[in-house]
Amino acid sequence: MKSPLIIFTLKCFIIIYFAACTGIGEGTAYKSATPQVTKGVWKVNLLNAAGKELAGELAGYTLTFLPSGKIIAVRNGELIRGNWSEDEILKRITINLETKDPYLTKLNDRWNISSVNAKDVTLQNTENSSGSRLQITSL
């Protein structure tokens, strides 16, 4: 009778030990960007592509992320539509604006989510060699 109880206790101890030592549960909290970006209007605060800062070229554009997956960019009354989505498993946002504007098309990509808060969302593209960075700021 004592042997199964000792084995069970030993197994529980080992599981708890490995869980504590390996940090299971640490760093797994993921904050989705969707609840933040769908709360209003945003502007591009930082766009670094191929080592060049391009946010100035996008000055005046506002971005609205709709919960339906649509995105609208507006500057001087001109509306540019597109689609966006968030993949919570891969922790990334995909943006696809229907435009030929060479600077606005730089937003069309799959962006890894670096950080999310009420005022800023910081994204990074690690799929290409340039390591582009994008930060949008709430207006």
Predicted regions located by residue number:
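Lipid interaction determinants
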Residues: C21-N83, I89-L139
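Sec-dependent bacterial lipoprotein signal peptides
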Residues: M1-C21
